């Protein structure tokens, strides 16, 4: 059997949808369970799960610490995930990929600017329709900031993130995950549309984080021990049938 290799993004351990599928409400319990599955897969099948070091490893460590996970979670990360720095200087990526990425980023930046312009116009329009007594300039300014600008800026931030960040590689760890997977000819495990999109561009296998635990369970369900037990049961059943026929 060809040994599988996987490169994990932080979302492979922290994805909310994955926890819901597995029936865990606690982030730490979900991380422990996934890491235990990885441990079994490594011991029974030699499946290797890598994490880019130090970028993604640091993210995982800080995520576990911020959410109050005990030392056992960090110990499992250190034990069962292979820490490896991606070889950024030797992994070849075609110039066409970078050309497409630059064009894609430019389009997203322009869309983000459009959202910002809409927010500014909305704020200006709201201000024009408000009373502005000169003797209450300070109070008026505070009211505008509180009642108008604050709410609009909040909406602007959400729209800007959606317009600019969704579907792009917006961090160094994202790029490290893809480079390491390309280097190792491994599959990427993540819950990130940007990573998924550019994994396809790079010809890297992608596995959604919420299906990864079920994939490992399926491997384990057909493991050598399980197959051997099934063969023993079948052999006993055949022997019993032969004895019955003889009688």
Curated annotation (Swiss-Prot):
Gene Ontology process terms (BP): tRNA 5'-leader removal
E.C. number: 3.1.26.5
Keyword terms: Endonuclease, Hydrolase, Nuclease, tRNA processing
Organism domain of life: Archaea
Top-rank EC class of the record's enzyme: hydrolase
Xref: InterPro entries: RNA_free_RNase_P
Catalytic activity: Endonucleolytic cleavage of RNA, removing 5'-extranucleotides from tRNA precursor
Pfam families: PIN_5
Disulphides: none
KW tRNA processing (keyword) present: yes
Any GO molecular function: ribonuclease P activity
Description of the deletion phenotype: Deletion mutant shows no growth phenotype under standard conditions or nitrogen deficiency.
Family membership noted in the UniProt record: Belongs to the HARP family.
Alphabetized HAMAP family for the sequence: RNA_free_RNase_P
Further facts: The ease to obtain knockout of this gene and the lack of growth phenotypes upon gene deletion suggests that archaeal HARPs do not make a major contribution to global tRNA 5'-end maturation in archaea, but may well exert a specialised, yet unknown function in (t)RNA metabolism.
Function text: RNA-free RNase P that catalyzes the removal of the 5'-leader sequence from pre-tRNA to produce the mature 5'-terminus.
Protein name, per record: RNA-free ribonuclease P
Higher taxonomy: Archaea, Methanobacteriati, Methanobacteriota, Stenosarchaea group, Methanomicrobia
